[in-house]
Amino acid sequence: MRNLVIMPAMANNRERMNLGEYAEEATIIMDEPVRPANHFIEANTQEATLHHLKHDCITPVFSKDNELTINHAAFVETIQDAAQSFFSGERVEQADIRVSHIIKGRIPEAIHKPANQLLESDKTIYYERAAFSIDVPTIYETVGGNKLNLSIVGVRAYNQMNLYSKKVPELFRLAIGFKNQVCCNMCIFTDGYKDDLRVSSTSELYRAALELFNNYNPAKHLYLMQQLGNTSMSEHQFAQIIGKMRLYQCLPTGYQKALPRMLLTDTQINSVAKAYIHDDNFGSFGSELNMWKFYNLLTGANKSSYIDSFLDLSLIH
């Protein structure tokens, strides 16, 4: 049988009719699902830009001598500069900033105005708490099938300082570790964390950041995280751990003091249990749960923490 060739019926008339004059290129429009962006911390916070912090927010002062504090924008910029200097040659991304606990005020000229008559220019704001994450995506590794990028995290909370005194060294928290790109969970190790960083100027803050980066051993941190995947627990053991975590708050004070502090709240513990069943990446309902997945269930629940306690709960001891 001869090969059958089907020719367009109008092929011979194509040149004469010049349909191209009337035809347009087809445009295929595809509806792509919009996925909400993951953040390293989510609940109780809102996104903020560096421009907003610099130009729309006032800077708190120490009330007894009217000395300026190091504001959130200066904190972010200083650590960003330190990261770009230390990791020269790597791609250092701009900070992802989250803030909470807005403090509102008004300018002196608007003191006697009713609240419903205030103009935007009459109002002042600043945020009591701020946190940021700076990723270095060119430094990465895979652990448990998850890509981890090097990440620097800073936390500042004015509520942990006495602003009614004279100027004293100011408290900051700074960490360097890895961010799980699957869920943006932060993985922090003790060697990469300064929980009581007190400085009086941005130059001191800059030097402290460089010192932290220099002392951090990413290879050791990655090795410890990789080892988590070598140990597993049964569903029964997981249920026992969750149950004992819930019992902790009910223990007499003497019993609690003899145990390591339970920093997770009951709500967060419930989130861990729910994620064990439903989480697509780290859930293991009906099967064994390795420690890497368990760790990510815990850090995932931690994303609902308040900013001032966030880094403490992300820590691997």
Predicted segments, located by residue:
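A short acidic/basic microdomain associated with nuclease active sites
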Residues: S85-T124, R129-A131
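A generic structural signal for well-ordered alpha-helical segments enriched in polar/charged residues
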Residues: D81, S85, L251-G254
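Feature for intrinsically disordered/low-complexity regulatory segments and propeptides
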Residues: M1-Q80, F87, R91, R98
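Intrinsically disordered, low-complexity regions enriched in serine/threonine
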Residues: M1-R35, P114-I316
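Histidine (H) residue identity feature
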Residues: H39, H51-H55, H72, H101, ...
